[in-house]
Each structure stands twice: as structure tokens, then as C-alpha cells.
């Protein structure tokens, strides 16, 4: 980065921090993008004059609302709901809803900002948004989750719609929660439309939607590996998380010939040197999706596995790492451990799971590193395909959706290579994804 570009980033970030104090996740996400785009922006008088990045970094609308609901003891509880409608230059706002105690405005603004670029990369007509609440569904009965979802949607419904804003699931929001919210939306609005994605197959959902983020991350990693004449076959893979993304990344990596040896949750991780095969993965899916248990129970059931409480799996020797849990879960020291252990490829299944220090280390050592906005775009791409099917009142077969998903991930990889290839031949996927995602949104904003 030259002096002019560096000065642009510092001035831009100083203004952003002044306007958005105490929002570290948002600052981190914007800085990463600004550093990638700065040389491009300072070379373009139009982008500077029209202040395109400054406009993208300011949400079009932020909605914050009260969510009162009745728990099983008959007591009133109050949570806070949010919807950040970031950018609608290329389509209706699109992005997930997250239910987790850590949810705050900074996290949702960072996610909505990232979502804008990710949705642009898919080439589908979707803007960027994100929402959620500090409600914690863990340990709650189905009845309590239903009451909360209904109260949440009672307010949210006035701000969304199939041509305005189309939410989906995220951490803490799966098929059960989407069902409760869709039912409430339908009761209040008296219409059956594709206003939410991630719906059940029998009522407007798309085949492969649950699998899409994990599968797409593997398809992207496969394309990256191919640039070095490598593949998943015979490789050892470390995956963090044990939710939707981690489960299907594990399944697809195994199908592609790799051996997945770790999964984790907020309490710790399991290491199974024999590999997590289809039968073991089925147990994990039952444990997590139905019984909502802890990953520790995997080690109790399979003697080949060992459980490490309070730790993350990045010290385990592997060829490919796929962080699929949550933001900033992989720091500089852990990145160095992966490098020292011979890891060649890191593909982010979660949103911004690697800290800036970790990314720097991966890039210094010329690892194949894919940021979440490119690698995990398969989820929102398939949400876009669900919106298309809802609009046309048809359902495609799983094979058709998989082929379209695969094609989208290959295209995203091509865009990253086009914009991210450095003079020495190294592909900087962070720069490639940021410039590729930015250009489409910027051109649309300039035209409007």
C-alpha cells in the first residue's frame, strides 16, 4: 500500500470510529476491506468524489426494538431485537437472524457489512442486511422459543418483505425458529411469500439449503487446492464448531476423500485421530440438532476420541483448517501453530473467524487462505436460489441446486483470482473478494 492509500485508510477509519464508537467488530471488518480497496479507490477520482466506500459503511437503516415475551413460569422477559439494513443497491436486503447473548449492534453491523460484499460476489440480486437478538435459545423449552420468535416477528414483520428484506437463519436460528417466525409472519400479513429463507422443504424451502454453507466452503477450498494441483483426497482436516456449517463441511470433506479429525463447541473440542466418518457424523447431528447436547458426549461414546475442555482445535496437526464456529476464534498464536504443523489451506466457514494477526501470518507464509465472505457464500447463494424458486412457485431437485451452488462457488473463486493475484503469483483471496464484491455494489450505487 502506498503512502496516499495508507493516508486514505487512516482518515477514513478515524471518521468511522468517531461516528461509531465502541464497535470493535465493525471497525475490524471495515478496516480489512478499506485496506484492500484503498489503492483501487485513490486511483479512481470518481470513487473518491462520490464517497462510495463511506456510503457503503453507513447502514441505510438500523431498527432496534423491544421483544417482551412470557416464559414457562409465567414471568415476563425482555430482550432486544435488531435489524441492520445495510445496502440495497443490487437487491433487497438479505442476511441472517442471530439469537445469541453476545449479539449487539457492533456485531450485527459487521455482519451486515460483510454480507453486502458476500451477496455481491454470488452474482445474485441481493443487498446486505443482518438481524438478531440477545435472546439465548440454549436451555429453553420449545414453547419458550416459540413465544420469543412470535414476539420478535410481531415487530420485525413491518420492516421486511420478499422485495424489501429477506431474513434467514444464523447462529441460534435453525429450522425450528424459522418455522415459528414464518408462521407468525403469515398470520399477521395474511400472505404466503418467500419473505424468509431456510424454510422446511414442505413449505417453500429449497433442497440443500441446510447443507449449502458447509458444502460451498468445501467447493471453494477444492478450487483453491486445485491452483496448487492438490485436492481433499488423503488430507487431514480440522474443523471447529459442530453446528450446521461444521456438520456439512465435515460431511462434504469426507465425501471428497479427506479425514476430518476435530469438531468443537463453546465448551471445548474433540480430537478423533481415526476420523469422523458418516456414522459418527450422524451421531453428532442427532446430539446437536435434536438433543442439543455438548460435543463432550462424542468422546464418551467413541473411545478413539479425546475431549479437550475449554480449548480450540488449532494445535492439532492437519493439512486443511476450516473454522466454522464464530468470529475471532482463531488468533495469531493459533495461526502460527497451524503453519508450524504443515497446514496448507484455511477456508473460513464462519464469518470473520480469523483475527487480523492470524490472516497476516497465513499470508506471510503463503498459505491458501479464503475469507468467509468468499468461502461461506454458498449459504446465502442457496438462499437466493430459494427466493427464485418461491417467486416462480417451483421446486428444483437437490441435484439441480447442488450444480448451481457448485457453479456459483467456482465463479466466486474465479473473481477472487482475477482481482487477487499478486505480482509474485500468490493469490490474495482477501483482496480479491473485497475488490470483486465492491465493484458490483459501487457501480450500482454510482448509477443510482
List PLM regions with ranges.
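Short, glycine-/Ser/Thr-/acidic-enriched flexible segments
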Residues: 70-72, 83-89, 104, 140, ...
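General beta-strand structural signal in soluble alpha/beta enzymes
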Residues: 164-168, 191-196, 239, 262-265, ...
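Rossmann-like adenosine-cofactor binding region
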Residues: 268-369, 374
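Buried hydrophobic packing segments
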Residues: 108-111, 181, 217-225, 249, ...
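Adenosine-phosphate binding glycine-rich loop
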Residues: 2-29, 224, 337-448
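N-terminal ligand-binding/catalytic initiation module
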Residues: 1-208, 440-448
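Glycine-rich phosphate/diphosphate-binding loop of Rossmann-like nucleotide-binding domains
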Residues: 197-200, 205-317
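Conserved active-site and cofactor/substrate-binding residues in soluble primary-metabolism enzymes
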Residues: 7, 21-28, 32, 47, ...
Amino acid at each position: 500500500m502506498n503512502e496516499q492509500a495508507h493516508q486514505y485508510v487512516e482518515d477514513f477509519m478515524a471518521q468511522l470510529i468517531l461516528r461509531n464508537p465502541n464497535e470493535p467488530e465493525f471497525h475490524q471488518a471495515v478496516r480489512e476491506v478499506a485496506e484492500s480497496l484503498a489503492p483501487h479507490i485513490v486511483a479512481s477520482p470518481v470513487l473518491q468524489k462520490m464517497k462510495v466506500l463511506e456510503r457503503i459503511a453507513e447502514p441505510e437503516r438500523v431498527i432496534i426494538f423491544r421483544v417482551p415475551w412470557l416464559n414457562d413460569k409465567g414471568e415476563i422477559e425482555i430482550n432486544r431485537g435488531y435489524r441492520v439494513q445495510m445496502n440495497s443497491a443490487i437487491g433487497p436486503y438479505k442476511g441472517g437472524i442471530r439469537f445469541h447473548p453476545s449479539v449487539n449492534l457492533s456485531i450485527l453491523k459487521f455482519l451486515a457489512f460483510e454480507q453486502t460484499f458476500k451477496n455481491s460476489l454470488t452474482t445474485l440480486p441481493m443487498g446486505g442486511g443482518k438481524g438478531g437478538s440477545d435472546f439465548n435459545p440454549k436451555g429453553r423449552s420449545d414453547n419458550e422459543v416459540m413465544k420469543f420468535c412470535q414476539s420478535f416477528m410481531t415487530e420485525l414483520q413491518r420492516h421486511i418483505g420478499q422485495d424489501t428484506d429477506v431474513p434467514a437463519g444464523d447462529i441460534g436460528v435453525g429450522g425450528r425458529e424459522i418455522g415459528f417466525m414464518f408462521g407468525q409472519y403469515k398470520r399477521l400479513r395474511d400472505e404466503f411469500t418467500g419473505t424468509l429463507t431456510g424454510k422446511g422443504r414442505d413449505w417453500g424451502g429449497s433442497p440443500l439449503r441446510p447443507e449449502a454453507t458447509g458444502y460451498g466452503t468445501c467447493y471453494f477450498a477444492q478450487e483453491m487446492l486445485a491452483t496448487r494441483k492438490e485436492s481433499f483426497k488423503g488430507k487431514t482436516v480440522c474443523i471447529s464448531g459442530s453446528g450446521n456449517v461444521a456438520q456439512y463441511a465435515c460431511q462434504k470433506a469426507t465425501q471428497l476423500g479427506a479425514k476430518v479429525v476435530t469438531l468443537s463447541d463453546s465448551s471445548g473440542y474433540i480430537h478423533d485421530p481415526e476420523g469422523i466418518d458418516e456414522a459418527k457424523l450422524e451421531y453428532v447431528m442427532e446430539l446437536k440438532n435434536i438433543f442439543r447436547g455438548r460435543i463432550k458426549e462424542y468422546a464418551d461414546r467413541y473411545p478413539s476420541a479425546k475431549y479437550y475442555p475449554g480449548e480450540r482445535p488449532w494445535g492439532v496437526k492437519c493439512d486443511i483448517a476450516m473454522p466454522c464456529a464464530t468470529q475471532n476464534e482463531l488468533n495469531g498464536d493459533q495461526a502460527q501453530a497451524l503453519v508450524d504443523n504443515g497446514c496448507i489451506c484455511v477456508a473460513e466457514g464462519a464469518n470473520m473467524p480469523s483475527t487480523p494477526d492470524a490472516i497476516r501470518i497465513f499470508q506471510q507464509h503463503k498459505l491458501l487462505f479464503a475469507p468467509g465472505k468468499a468461502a461461506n457464500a454458498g449459504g446465502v447463494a442457496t438462499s437466493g436460489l430459494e427466493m427464485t424458486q418461491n417467486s416462480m412457485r417451483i421446486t428444483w431437485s437437490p441435484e439441480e441446486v447442488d450444480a448451481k451452488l457448485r457453479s456459483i462457488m467456482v465463479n466466486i473463486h474465479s473473481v477472487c483470482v482475477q482481482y487477487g493475484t499478486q505480482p509474485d503469483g500468490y493469490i490474495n483471496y482477501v483482496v480479491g473478494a473485497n475488490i470483486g464484491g465492491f465493484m458490483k455494489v459501487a457501480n450500482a450505487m454510482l448509477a443510482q
